UniProtKB/Swiss-Prot annotation:
Name recorded for this polypeptide: Two-component response regulator-like PRR73
Ranges of biased composition (kind: Basic residues): 727-738
Domain CCT: 712-754
Higher taxonomy: Eukaryota, Viridiplantae, Streptophyta, Embryophyta, Tracheophyta
Short name of one Pfam family: Response_reg
PROSITE patterns: CCT (PS51017), RESPONSE_REGULATORY (PS50110)
Region (Disordered): 1-64, 205-272, 312-388, 476-546, 646-701, 727-767
Biased composition (Low complexity): 205-214, 518-531
Polar residues biased stretches: 263-272, 343-361, 488-497, 532-543
Domain Response regulatory: residue ranges: 82-200
Subcellular localization, as worded in the UniProt entry: Nucleus
């Protein structure tokens, strides 16, 4: 169906075709005068664009053939396609030209890209298709493709690339530049037969709904396409700066779309060009869709600046101010992302999404039109840089409501006096924690001193949370100000332990996240940003309160706290009284906790067997005093833990090795109060680097470790002895076979015995 000579049985015979007078002569060519007249658009008065001589009579069979031929020419009016073949190799060019002529194409050969471009510039050639090689001297195929796509007239000509290099990079580059297809050499005849489909798609798409003359419709509609392209590019350029580079880019993208946007059947070019135009073109947004300002760079990439969406509703005189406002928004966005606080516009909380316009800056543009340029800039900076009072009131009300629920929730806890600094610290804690809980990890820029803001930034960057903390036990006691959460419950009773084992009444607003998560029975994945703020900024407050030694003694039995790496603080001094005072100071930095009650409750939950075993085996070491306070509980109260230094795996695995090491280390643990304590999750690292946590709670961890080492060494020695014996036997056997091979002759690869005496002598030697 590609040409007249390939019509097959669907076409009438040559005599019938000649009789119908459609201008189709033998050999599939038409009169030159008729073809030129048809290309110049002179035959528009005729139905097919051809000269039809009148016939006096026509039979019904001839009318059917005529209708069939008219329908065929409606879709492909060109009788023979002219193909510009660009190939630098002479033999390849001749072979491909012969194949194209066999497929009834007219071939115009070109040796290189420059010659091909000269042929394209000559409009008398009427080239319908370009088949070019990728790699050529002077002007390559990709360079020729770029020239064709950028030309106003030649951009409608389909370009097919061919090359022996079929790498993905080459194909991707050619298709992205505007090629409609890519053929891999050697080229087959069947591939060349189907080249007409690209021209048919182009003519059919440009002619609208399948008009009778596709090329004439294309010539008529090309100025319309250019006008639409200019309008679209003009509207797009209003959104951007008036730079020549931007206009050129828009020209290329829209030009590709005007030429190849309708190649729905090929699936090659339209997929590349449509995306660029869809991204650049403004799309009207519905008023119901909320258009909040993006708070992340990912959102900025996915959603283009909302200014583009509002240009259809804004006057043209106001678009320049929109650009300035966009730059100010970008500056403020970078500034607030740097310090960890979001930029909040005045419209973000005041109006609902249905009441908001399509663009948050639209109302500001409408109200600020009469004002001067500097006034608009200063107003936009003020609205973007400072949180409004309505926002602060909203967050404060949320914090107060959550705090009331928290107080009602823990009203059964023992009455412990909690002295929390009031004023700006409390407001800052409530604002930051509630924004992190309700508004999704957003930090507000509050009015505080420079040192407090600096500490907050450090906290944000220094979170010790990991992906596995949510699977451990929930923090039962207070976590807000003390910098630790003593885990007083096993893993299976997280929500129950929160109700029964919480022993302090927290007055800080920073415990809202803990109460909310604890009530759901979830883990202690809380906001680490504000939980240790008081412990960091004021580490030496409330130093006078001391916990009784019985509480410290309980810590030795239960090991309820997770050991952490210790940092030196003024409260930690070597000695019995100083250690107790340091523990008390660590607890009283934030909120005092009744440690003895919580430890004893937890003792009955989990570590009863550990308590019994340690009473029998480790009673002398427990009564030694403060030297045993180093068993992992005194280190918990350091402020830089950031609120999750509790023992998250209180299932007995840590406590057994813990108490086992205390008996061996003895007084040597007291000097470790003032230096970093190297403790692991499962036990204490001894001086020789061996961890002693065995989890059984019976006996010393180091004893079992030494027994295991001895057992392994014995097994290794036994294995080595066996290997020596086995290798010795192999060595002897190999030497005897070598000697036998030298003594015995071979026939066809087999040993042949010479005499029985030699065999007997060889056997004696082997023995």
């Amino acid at each position: 169906m590609g040409s007249a000579c390939e019509a097959g049985t669907d076409e009438p015979s040559r005599d019938d075709v000649k009789g119908t007078g459609n201008g189709i002569l033998e050999n599939g060519h038409s009169h030159k005068s008729e073809e030129e007249e048809w290309r110049n658009g002179m035959g528009e008065d005729l139905p097919n664009g051809h000269s039809t001589p009148p016939e006096p009579q026509q039979t019904d069979e001839q009318k059917e053939h005529q209708v069939r031929i008219v329908r065929w020419e409606r879709f492909l009016p060109v009788k023979t396609l002219r193909v510009l073949l660009v190939e630098n190799d002479d033999s390849t060019r001749q072979v491909v030209s012969a194949l194209l002529r066999k497929c009834c194409y007219e071939v115009i050969p070109a040796e290189n890209g420059l010659h091909a471009w000269q042929c394209l510039e000559d409009l008398q050639n009427h080239i319908d298709l370009v088949l070019t090689e990728v790699v050529m001297p002077r002007l390559s195929g990709i360079g020729l493709l770029s020239k064709i796509t950028s030309h106003k007239i030649c951009k409608d000509i389909p370009v097919i690339m061919m090359s022996s290099n079929d790498s993905m990079g080459t194909v991707f580059k050619c298709l992205s530049k505007g090629a409609v297809d890519f053929l891999v050499k050697p080229i087959r005849k069947n591939e060349l037969k189907n080249l007409w489909q690209h021209v048919w798609r182009r003519c059919h798409s440009s002619s609208g709904s399948g008009s009778e003359s596709g090329i004439r419709t294309q010539k008529c509609t090309k100025p319309k396409v250019d006008d639409e392209y200019e309008n679209n590019s003009g509207s797009n350029n209003d959104n951007e700066d008036d730079d020549d580079n931007d206009e050129d880019d828009d020209d290329l993208s829209v030009g590709h779309n005007a030429r190849d946007g309708s190649d729905n059947g090929s699936g090659t070019q339209s997929s590349w060009t449509k995306r660029a135009v869809e991204i650049d073109s403004p799309q009207q947004m519905s008023p119901d869709q909320p258009s909040d300002l993006p708070d992340s760079t990912c959102a900025q990439v996915i959603h283009p600046t909302s200014e583009i969406c509002s240009n259809r509703w804004l006057p043209t005189a106001n678009k320049r101010s929109g650009k300035k406002h966009k730059e100010n928004n970008d500056d403020s966005m970078g500034k607030y992302l740097e310090i960890g606080a979001p930029r909040n516009s005045s419209m973000e909380y005041q109006s609902s999404p249905r009441e908001m316009s399509v663009n948050p800056t639209e109302k500001q543009h409408e109200t600020l039109m009469p004002q001067s340029k500097t006034t608009r800039e200063t107003d936009s900076r003020n609205t973007q840089n400072e949180p409004t009072t309505q926002t602060v009131d909203l967050i404060s009300s949320i914090a107060r409501s959550t705090d009331d629920k928290q107080v009602v929730r823990i009203n059964n806890a023992p009455d412990c006096s909690s002295k929390v600094p009031d004023g700006n610290d409390k407001n800052r804690d409530s604002l930051i924690d509630m924004t992190s809980e309700e508004l999704g990890l957003k930090r507000l820029k509050t009015t505080g001193s420079a040192t407090e803001i600096h500490d907050e930034r450090n906290i944000l960057k220094r979170s010790d949370l990991s992906a596995f903390t949510r699977y451990h036990t929930t923090v039962a006691s207070n976590q807000g100000g003390a910098g630790f959460g003593g885990s007083c419950s096993p893993q299976d009773n997280s929500s129950e332990a929160l109700k029964t084992d919480s022993n302090c009444k927290v007055k800080s607003n920073s415990d809202a996240a803990e109460i909310k998560q604890g009530s759901n029975g979830s883990s202690n994945n809380n906001d680490m940003g504000s939980s240790t703020k008081n412990a960091i900024t004021k580490p030496s407050s409330n130093r006078g309160k001391v916990i009784s030694p019985s509480a410290v003694k309980a810590t030795q039995h239960t090991s309820a706290f997770h050991p952490v790496q210790r940092q030196t603080s003024p409260a930690n001094v070597v000695g019995k009284d100083k250690v107790d005072e340091g523990i008390a100071n660590g607890v009283n930095v934030g909120h005092p906790v009744d440690v003895q009650n919580s430890f004893m409750q937890h003792h009955h939950h989990v570590h009863y067997y550990v308590h019994v075993m340690t009473q029998q085996q480790q009673q002398p070491s427990i009564e030694r005093g403060s030297s045993d306070a180093q068993c992992g509980s005194s280190n918990v109260f350091d402020p830089p833990i950031e609120g999750h230094a509790a023992n998250y795996s209180v299932n007995g695995s840590f406590s057994g090795g813990h108490n086992g090491n205390n008996g061996q280390r003895g007084p040597s643990t007291a000097p470790n109060v003032g230096r970093p304590n190297m403790e692991t999750v499962n036990g204490i690292v001894d001086e020789n680097g061996a961890g002693g946590g065995n989890g059984s709670g019976s006996g010393s961890g180091n004893d079992l470790y030494q027994n295991g080492v001895c057992y392994r060494e014995a097994a290794l020695n036994k294995f080595r002895q066996k290997r020596k014996v086995r290798n010795f036997g192999k060595k002897v056997r190999y030497q005897s076979r070598k000697r036998l091979a030298e003594q015995r002759p071979r026939i066809r690869g087999q040993f042949v015995r010479q005499s029985g005496q030699e065999d007997q002598a060889g056997q004696d030697e082997d023995r």
